């Protein structure tokens, strides 16, 4: 009695909890029902057994989850773990991470596919393939837009009330690929997955359930055949077969409309509720519309997948309705694991796959509590036709099984699984009770629905249109009907599936891929163009015939539909009778279920109590399982680390092998070079020995001839001596008398001569005292160009004299000597040159005591600088605006590069930016500086290979921008003692990387110009020069220059600037074709309509900006600060070399873009950049002064014995070459300015000494490049300039002109070298008879006349040369042409001049 009371009390507590918690408590999957506590918040508590949870987790791992299902599983799993573990140990699974990773995986696959298609099209160079890809992408864009409209329509449909909501909705969302890709070899777990919309019996208004994971439909699988069989089986109970397809649309809509009910459980909201047969209202829709809808649904992914071994609970496919089919209690066991609650008026449930829940089901079967009753889909149709509900079978078998279980099982032997089974049985009983009540209501509604359907069918009119869409819809609808009505046997389906599965397991992946249908590139676009071709249009007769055929088919279809309508009415009447009978059976069934529930309650309580005992034992099993999972994950991580280590070691081995191979190749090359050197040395020794032998023989012959001549001369001398003695003896007497008479006159003249001699000695002493150097005023020797500490002035000519060179040049000048002779005369005769020089030094050359003009000049210079800076700001603003337009234009272009180091360069560029951005404003730490140097070193090693692709890849990755950020550290320095944030060594490395990026890379140099990065380099260069070279008056320019300016940073900036401008010169686009220059922006065309192409505009702005910022003055100060040789100072030599190279590049670019004609001798000279004026004001930026000091200030010369040094080191030679190239480029830019500057007093003397010394060096040491530059420069100096022609033939012998005539014989025989020498000789001697006489002493002038005549007669030389396009740069060989070194209009006169014989 007490036991009965306790059970009764327990039963009352359970009932009270059930009454308070609702249907959520009845759906619990737990070990026990907590009797003492419950949640106050009203939320459900759901406890799940260990095996059940593990089954759910296994199912989640073995199935591909959609994003919507992920959210549902998260909420369900969280609820389960809330009761299994303590609150402190609760760990929520991060399903959102899985969803994000799955989404990233999809987009990664999409990106890879697009990249592969792009690479294929690019490699094939096929426009057809590109068009086909564009066509497919447009179609996919349309599909996704249609999907957006579909989702919006679904949301709108949910918000509408039930009365105004349509009964069905067919929507074609995805037209491009209605079926998913067929998985070639799916695993067993992936095949046995539940259907897309899993259904379960709903015993309440909103039951909290967990949606089962689902796979996307995989084409036409075995589950599709089951679906086809199911629809074919149920077709007999339907009114028309065509109504079996529209519910698929509802299933499609249900996947995307999910929400949570009032109790916090996630539910799937259908597109519209699936109403029962008695409550759903059928609209008045034509049969043609239903057929079209069935066709649309057949193309979508709305096919429900059914597991091969799951129990078919009963799914009645009709026009938006479903039949209620109760199943055996055993069938609900697994439905509690993964149920899917559907917010509908009527629900059914299906089971999970047998293989997915095999562990639970095997446990259930071992206990032998309940035997499973499988209801095939054929039974559903039989029950519907016979009117026998399946619940009768359940009611007959359940009491017998229950009694057998009660007799066989003892309460002490009940296992944990048995308690779970009994709990689920009670839950199923409650659900069946609810389902029975709903089924009764559904039967009543079904009856009413059938009545309305009969009335609607009787009032429905048949309306068949004959257009193409209706005909296509009808044809597709009939095909869908035939498919849905097809009959298939379940055994056939299983046999076919097993055959296909065995074939998949025995076939390799490659064979499966090869059996995929091939898709030739371009086939799609070809077929699209072929099908859309205008030639496929029908003629009027064909269209009329086609229309008549459609009319006939439509008439036949109308008759067919009328017959189907009659048949449908008959079936509806029969079904109405069946439904009424079914309603009566359901009422009887409800009574039997109540009796069965009372019998089962007592047994269930006993089982539930036994289950509590086993709960603790399962905890250890769960802990072991978690430990096993953690161990497995650790092993997987270890395996990944080992595989990465193996790949790393393999890569190191490959690099070592490559390094060893390169070392061997280098050693082989060195050995080959040494072998060639030994062979050349042996040949040279042989030639030397041969020459020595010949020289000895020649000396022996000469010595023998000399001895013979000497003997004959001695004999003749003795004979002449005897004759002379005899004649002298005869004349001695007569001469003695004459000598005595003349002795007095001679004595008088001798005294006068001694007096004049003493005066001359006194004058020379005075002159020596006047000269600071104490050197004789003979211009045959090179005087010093060092500025005087106190400047001198010629009071007669009012000329300022700054150095000894200017003094000698002025005193020897024609104007000064003429002025002295006009102002002074001695005894009516003209003064000699020595007298004029002596008088000038003694009387007219005076020291300047106070330089009164200095303040005024300084003020004027300051105002000029301010004006230039304002102009430079305007130019920079214009350049920045154009740079922004260029960058916006280049953003649309994808600069691709096939560099093998592209990824590495991108990473290194990002590292540079990161290191600069992370660092604060203070000085960098040593570790950060080391990291920066390592990064720059890696970039340097890659770019030193001089691969253009690597250079472009580094620029595209933002490398130049990162280098600019690094170099910004120089800007804050305002004086020499300022400590930089980044060490100078690192800055020099950055400059070196910048240089390597732009060296011989026209693309990068063009980008530096057009993106205005060149302005940053120039500003940085001017800033460095400003720090080390203070602003000075022109009179003392260069005296206060800090020697630190010649260090590496400033030199690197000069080198980079020269490299960029030089590359722009070498790769400058022509006027007709400009591949490297982007199209000129519209705004720029409006601002400067008269200007040339963008390249010319940008270069003009750049040169104008540099000139106005004072770069020329700063460089001039640096050049003037050099007062000695650079042999022992290589840093200074490199600085001077790159500075002269920068000036050379600026002159060459200015010549190319100023827009004047190609001829150098054109008088229409316009230089809007101001470069010519700046160089003219600074005497060629002091380069000639620097070169003179480098060449001559390193020697101590004795006026009587010493001669200038003519052997120079390589550093000096390179400085001389760059300086002469600058002279020649400036001469090409503005020849009169060059001749006037170099031909002025002082510089003309320095130029003559410099040219003579360099020619002497080239005569001793072979240096062709230097010799050619000197020859060309002398030609530009003397062409059409009589005063300069006199300079080259003056001085000590051999003069400059004589040295040109004494060049090796190859310069008079080799056509290539003749082209170099002869134009300079013609320029130096034309219309100068004295120079021509000197020339004729060394060579024949006929050679020059013949040279001119040959060039004049050469086809194309005389005619085409003057008509070169404007703005073209002089090439490496163009400046050697005669037309560019001597005016063409004077060729004939020059030829006549050199053919004319001079009178001796």
From Swiss-Prot:
A zinc finger (C2H2-type) spans 792-816. GO terms for molecular function: nucleic acid binding; zinc ion binding. Phosphorylated in vitro by the CCNA2/CDK2 complex. It comes from Homo sapiens. It is linked to Intellectual developmental disorder and retinitis pigmentosa: An autosomal recessive disease characterized by mild to moderate intellectual disability, retinitis pigmentosa, and attention deficit-hyperactivity disorder observed in some patients. It comes from the Eukaryota. CCNA2/CDK2 regulatory protein that transiently maintains CCNA2 in the cytoplasm. Changing residue 1219 to N: In IDDRP; uncertain significance. Keywords: Disease variant, Endoplasmic reticulum, Intellectual disability, Metal-binding, Nucleus, Phosphoprotein, Retinitis pigmentosa, Zinc, Zinc-finger. Residues 36-61, 226-277, 517-550, 701-723 are annotated as: Disordered. This is S phase cyclin A-associated protein in the endoplasmic reticulum. GO terms for cellular component: cytosol; endoplasmic reticulum; nuclear speck; nucleoplasm; ooplasm; sperm head. The modification Phosphoserine is found at residue 832. It holds the Pfam family zf-met. Residues 231-243 have a biased composition (Polar residues). One of its GO terms (biological process) is seminiferous tubule development. The lineage of its organism: Eukaryota, Metazoa, Chordata, Craniata, Vertebrata. The keyword Nucleus applies. It is found in: Endoplasmic reticulum; Nucleus. Residues 539-550 have a biased composition (Basic and acidic residues). Widely expressed with high expression in testis. Isoform 1 is detected in various tissues, including retina, fetal and adult brain. Isoform 2 is expressed in the retina at high levels, and in the brain at very low levels. The gene is SCAPER.
């Amino acid at each position: 009695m007490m036991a009965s009371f306790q059970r009764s009390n327990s039963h009352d507590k359970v009932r009270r909890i059930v009454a308070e918690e609702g249907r959520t408590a009845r759906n619990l999957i737990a070990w026990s029902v907590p009797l003492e506590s419950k949640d106050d918040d009203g939320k459900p508590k759901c406890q799940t057994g260990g095996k059940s949870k593990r089954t759910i987790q296994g199912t989640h791992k073995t199935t591909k989850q959609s994003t919507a299902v992920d959210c549902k599983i998260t909420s369900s799993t969280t609820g389960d773990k809330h009761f299994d573990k303590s609150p402190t140990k609760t760990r929520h699974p991060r399903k959102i991470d899985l969803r994000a990773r799955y989404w990233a995986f999809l987009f990664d696959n999409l990106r890879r596919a697009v990249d592969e298609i792009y690479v294929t099209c690019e490699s094939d160079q096929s426009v057809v393939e590109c068009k086909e890809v564009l066509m497919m992408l447009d179609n996919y864009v349309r599909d996704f837009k249609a999907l957006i409209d579909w989702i919006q329509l679904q949301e709108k449909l949910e918000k509408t009330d039930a009365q105004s909501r349509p009964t069905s909705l067919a929507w074609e969302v995805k037209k491009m690929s209605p079926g998913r890709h067929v998985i070639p070899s799916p695993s067993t777990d992936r095949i046995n997955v539940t259907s897309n919309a899993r259904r379960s019996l709903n015993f309440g208004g909103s039951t909290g359930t967990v949606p089962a994971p689902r796979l996307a439909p995989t084409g036409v699988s075995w589950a599709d055949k089951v679906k086809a069989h199911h629809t074919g089986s149920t077709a007999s109970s339907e009114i028309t077969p065509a109504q079996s397809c529209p519910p698929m649309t509802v299933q499609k809509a249900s996947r995307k409309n999910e929400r949570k009910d009032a109790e916090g459980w996630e539910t799937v909201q259908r597109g519209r509720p699936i109403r029962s047969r008695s409550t759903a209202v059928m609209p008045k829709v034509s049969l043609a519309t239903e057929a079209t809808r069935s066709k649309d649904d057949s193309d979508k992914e709305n096919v429900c997948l059914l597991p091969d071994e799951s129990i078919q609970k009963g799914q009645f496919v009709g026009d938006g309705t479903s039949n209620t089919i109760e199943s055996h209690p055993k069938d609900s066991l697994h439905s509690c694991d993964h149920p899917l609650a559907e917010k509908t008026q009527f629900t059914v449930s299906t089971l999970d796959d047998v293989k997915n829940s095999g562990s639970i089901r095997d446990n259930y079967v071992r206990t032998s509590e309940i035997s499973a009753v499988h209801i095939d889909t054929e039974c559903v149709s039989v029950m519907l036709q016979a009117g026998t509900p399946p619940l009768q079978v359940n009611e007959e078998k359940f009491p017998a099984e229950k009694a057998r279980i009660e007799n066989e099982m003892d309460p002490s032997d009940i296992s944990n699984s048995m308690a779970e089974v009994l709990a689920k049985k009670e839950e199923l009983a409650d659900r069946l009770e609810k389902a029975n009540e709903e089924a009764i209501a559904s039967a009543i509604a079904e009856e009413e629905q059938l009545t309305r359907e009969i009335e609607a069918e009787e009032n429905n009119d048949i309306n068949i249109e004959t257009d193409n869409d209706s005909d296509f819809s009808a044809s597709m609808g009939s095909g869908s009907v035939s498919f849905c009505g097809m009959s298939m046997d379940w055994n056939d389906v299983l046999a076919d599936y097993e055959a296909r599965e065995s074939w998949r397991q025995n076939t390799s992946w490659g064979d499966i891929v090869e059996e995929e249908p091939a898709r030739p590139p371009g086939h799609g676009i070809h077929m699209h163009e072929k099908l859309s071709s205008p030639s496929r249009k029908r003629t009027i007769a064909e269209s009329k015939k086609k229309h008549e055929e459609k009319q006939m088919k439509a008439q036949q279809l109308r008759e067919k539909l009328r017959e189907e309508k009659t048949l449908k009415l008959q079936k509806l009447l029969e079904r109405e009778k069946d439904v009424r009978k079914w309603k009566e059976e359901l009422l009887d069934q409800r009574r039997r279920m109540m009796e069965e529930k009372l019998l089962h309650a007592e047994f269930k309580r006993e089982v539930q109590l036994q289950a509590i005992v086993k709960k603790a034992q399962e905890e250890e099993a769960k802990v072991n399982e978690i430990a096993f999972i953690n161990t497995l994950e650790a092993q997987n991580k270890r395996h990944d680390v080992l595989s990465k280590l193996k790949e790393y070691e393999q890569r190191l081995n490959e690099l070592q092998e490559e390094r060893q191979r390169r070392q061997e190749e280098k050693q082989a090359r060195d050995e080959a070079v040494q072998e060639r050197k030994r062979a050349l040395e042996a040949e040279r020794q042989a030639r030397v020995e041969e020459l020595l032998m010949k020289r000895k023989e020649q000396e022996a012959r000469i010595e023998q001839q000399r001895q013979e001549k000497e003997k004959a001369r001695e004999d003749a001398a003795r004979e002449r001596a005897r004759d002379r003695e005899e004649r002298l003896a005869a004349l001695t007497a007569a001469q003695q008398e004459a000598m005595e008479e003349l002795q007095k006159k001679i004595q008088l003249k001798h005294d006068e001569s001694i007096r004049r001699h003493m005066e001359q000695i006194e004058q020379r002493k005075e002159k020596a005292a006047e000269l600071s150097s104490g050197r004789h005023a003979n211009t045959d020797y090179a005087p010093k160009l060092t500025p005087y500490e106190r400047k001198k002035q010629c009071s007669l000519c009012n000329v300022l004299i700054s150095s000894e060179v200017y003094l000698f040049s002025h005193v020897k000048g024609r104007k000064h000597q003429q002025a002295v002779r006009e102002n002074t005369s001695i005894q009516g005769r003209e003064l000699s040159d020595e007298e004029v020089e002596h008088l000038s030094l003694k009387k007219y050359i005076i020291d300047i005591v106070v330089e009164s003009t200095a303040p005024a000049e300084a003020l004027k210079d300051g105002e000029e600088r301010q004006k230039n800076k304002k102009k430079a700001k305007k130019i920079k603003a214009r350049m920045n605006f154009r740079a922004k337009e260029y960058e916006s234009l280049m953003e649309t272009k994808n600069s691709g590069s096939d560099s093998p180091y592209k990824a590495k360069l991108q990473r290194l560029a990002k590292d540079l930016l990161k290191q600069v951005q992370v660092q604060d404003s203070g000085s960098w730490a040593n570790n950060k500086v080391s990291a920066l140097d390592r990064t720059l070193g890696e970039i340097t090693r890659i770019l030193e290979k001089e691969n253009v692709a690597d250079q472009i890849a580094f620029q595209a990755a933002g490398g130049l921008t990162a280098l600019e950020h690094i170099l910004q550290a120089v800007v804050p320095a305002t004086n020499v003692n300022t400590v930089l944030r980044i060490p100078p060594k690192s800055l020099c490395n950055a400059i070196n990387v910048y240089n390597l990026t732009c060296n011989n890379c026209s693309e990068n140099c063009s980008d530096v110009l057009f993106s205005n990065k060149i302005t940053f380099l120039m500003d940085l260069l001017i800033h460095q020069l400003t720090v080390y070279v203070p602003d000075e008056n022109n009179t003392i320019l260069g005296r206060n220059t800090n020697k630190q300016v010649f260090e590496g940073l400033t030199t690197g900036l000069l080198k980079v600037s020269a490299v960029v401008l030089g590359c722009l010169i070498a790769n400058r686009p022509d006027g007709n074709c400009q591949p490297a220059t982007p199209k000129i922006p519209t705004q720029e065309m409006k601002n400067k309509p008269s200007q040339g192409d963008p390249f010319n505009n940008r270069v003009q702005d750049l040169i104008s900006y540099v000139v106005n910022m004072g770069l020329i003055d700063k460089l001039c100060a640096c050049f003037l600060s050099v007062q000695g040789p650079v042999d022992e100072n290589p840093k200074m030599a490199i600085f001077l070399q790159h500075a002269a190279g920068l000036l050379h590049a600026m002159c060459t670019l200015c010549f190319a873009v100023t827009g004047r004609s190609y001829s150098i001798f054109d008088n229409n000279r316009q230089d809007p950049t101001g470069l010519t004026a700046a160089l003219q004001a600074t005497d060629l930026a002091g380069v000639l002064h620097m070169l003179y000091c480098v060449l001559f200030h390193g020697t101590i010369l004795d006026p009587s014995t010493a001669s200038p040094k003519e052997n120079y080191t390589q550093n000096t030679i390179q400085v001389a070459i760059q300086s002469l190239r600058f002279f020649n480029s400036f001469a090409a830019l503005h020849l009169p300015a060059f001749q006037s500057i170099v031909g002025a007093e002082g510089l003309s003397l320095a130029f003559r000494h410099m040219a003579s010394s360099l020619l002497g060096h080239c005569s001793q040491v072979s240096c062709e490049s230097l010799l050619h530059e000197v020859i060309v420069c002398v030609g530009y100096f003397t062409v059409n300039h009589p005063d300069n022609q006199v300079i080259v033939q003056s001085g000590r012998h051999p003069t400059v002109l004589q040295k040109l005539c004494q060049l090796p014989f190859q310069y008079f025989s080799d056509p290539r070298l003749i082209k170099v020498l002869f134009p300079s000789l013609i320029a130096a001697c034309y219309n100068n008879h004295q120079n021509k006489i000197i020339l004729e002493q060394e060579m024949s002038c006929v050679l020059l006349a013949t040279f001119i005549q040959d060039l004049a007669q050469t086809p194309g030389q005389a005619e085409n040369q003057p008509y070169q396009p404007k703005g073209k740069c002089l090439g490496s060989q163009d400046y050697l042409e005669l037309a560019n070194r001597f005016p063409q209009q004077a060729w004939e006169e020059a030829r006549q001049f050199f053919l004319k014989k001079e009178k001796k």
